[in-house]
Regions:
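P-loop NTPase nucleotide-binding core
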Residues: 42-45, 49-189
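The catalytic "switch" region of P-loop NTPases
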Residues: 1-4, 10-15, 26, 64, ...
């Protein structure tokens, strides 16, 4: 990528320089995003084993789209695996969206921890932006939230990107990282006895909207396959496999880049051996250079 990128979202990879290769995947997704204003981009599922680079790809896509400052706005949300109450999950989802949307509108990078803002900060920042739609959506959600109406709160939160698309005349890329966790760790009651195991099904209709297509990821292929078959029937998500391996040439470049970053000189021959032994997998390359072995 030769374009200037502002890293508005702190990437988990650490130093952005360590994002190596992935030219095919990034070209695919950037072309996909460029077609969103034509309303022909279909929602996708990035599927690959853990540590295969899905999060790095999604976060880099976010930062590229944020930097371009066009009418395609990125939204990135990671589903975590601790048990969560559905109301709290919905609150986190919509605050994360509004935080990132206001970050985009004000051209203000997010904090280094990528945390969503409090409602007070969202309201304060929006006073300068003066977006009445944000005020309206906040008030609607908080009314449901304070009354404990989890179904209405969830529906409102999940539908927020599409809602803003029609009112602010923009488009969104809705990225949900590790979406399969939504079937396992979210509960409707504080006692954690009623599981919201079909929660991804709440996106059943939203996933087909071309104004805010979704890009979801999952690390457990069998789990993801079952979820898609059960809750996104009819090919609503385009299966997009992500290999853990770079191309051979990208792997060689990654070896030299990590060697430079760790101040460890390598020759062409030693780089070739490392690239071959690690099967040009950037995770294993990074582990090798980060090890304590001499």
């Amino acid at each position: 990528m030769t374009e200037q990128i502002t890293y508005a979202l702190e990437e988990r990879i650490g130093n952005p320089y360590l994002f190596c290769g992935r030219e095919r995947e990034m070209n695919l997704l950037l072309n996909w995003a460029s077609l969103i204003p034509r309303k022909i981009s279909k929602s996708r599922a990035l599927v690959g084993r853990r540590k295969s680079g899905k999060t790095a790809i999604m976060q880099r896509l976010f930062n590229i789209l944020w930097s371009r400052n066009s009418n395609v706005v990125p939204f990135y949300f990671e589903v975590l695996d601790p048990n969560q109450l559905l109301l709290d999950f919905s609150d986190q989802y919509i605050r994360t969206f509004l935080t990132q949307y206001l970050s985009f509108l004000t051209r203000t990078p997010l904090d280094n921890d990528n945390e969503s803002w409090s409602w007070n900060k969202v309201e304060a920042v929006n006073r300068d932006v003066a977006n009445n739609n944000i005020t309206e959506k906040m008030n609607t959600f908080l009314e449901y939230f304070e009354k404990g109406q989890h179904h209405q709160a969830t529906t409102t939160a999940f539908g927020t990107p599409a809602w803003f698309s029609s009112r602010d005349k923009v488009f969104f890329v809705v990225m949900i990282d590790e979406i399969q966790y939504m079937t396992e760790y979210i509960y409707k009651d504080k006692q954690e006895t009623v599981q919201a195991h079909r929660l991804p099904g709440a996106f059943h209709g939203l996933v087909e909207l071309k104004v805010a297509p979704m890009l979801v990821s999952g690390s457990y292929i069998g789990w993801m396959t079952q979820m898609i078959q059960d809750m996104f029937v009819g090919g609503r998500l385009k299966w997009t496999p992500i290999s853990s391996q770079l191309t051979f040439a990208e792997g060689m470049a990654a070896v030299f880049r990590y060697a430079e970053y760790h101040n460890m000189p390598v020759t062409e021959r030693s780089a070739l051996i490392i690239n071959t032994l690690t099967q040009h997998d950037p995770f294993y390359i990074s582990m090798l250079f980060g090890s304590d072995c001499p």
